[in-house]
Amino acid sequence: NPNKIIEDTDVRQMLGLADKTKLINLISYVFQGDEKKTINLLEDLIDSGLDAKNFLNDFLELLYLFGRRANLGPIEKDMFLSEAELELIEKSSQNLNMQDLSLFWQLTLKTIEDLKIVSSENIALEMFLLQLIHLKNLEDLSDEKVFGHKQIINDEIPKKKIENEN
């Protein structure tokens, strides 16, 4: 239709780009450990024509922004993000630490390499997100949750005073 106005969603679909708001929500679901919402949103993005490599590069960019937020406080104006997206990042990054973000960064880089050898990029993306969720869930397992009590570390073992009997 020559009279049809091209929308930003049309351009994103043609280029295989994801809506940043949806990506921020997806990362938030991963951080929350919500597999169902994560996979449903991924499927929605794939149905919209998502390109796996673009997705992972956008994911890296957002991890960087989450890390910047975690280390330096609220993000000031950013040319590539709307005010609503900045608010979403602010809200979603409340309890994040650099250790998690660094692990997510490394796994994202590895998955970009994996895309070169897998036959189904969509399955690779789904497995990538599930790995992130389970990695985060493992991180959240404290000794008390796993063992029912805090484990004693060598430094915490009470030391008996040894007196010299000379």
Predicted regions, residues:
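Extended, largely alpha-helical regulatory/partner-binding modules appended to the mid-to-C-terminal parts
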Residues: 1-154
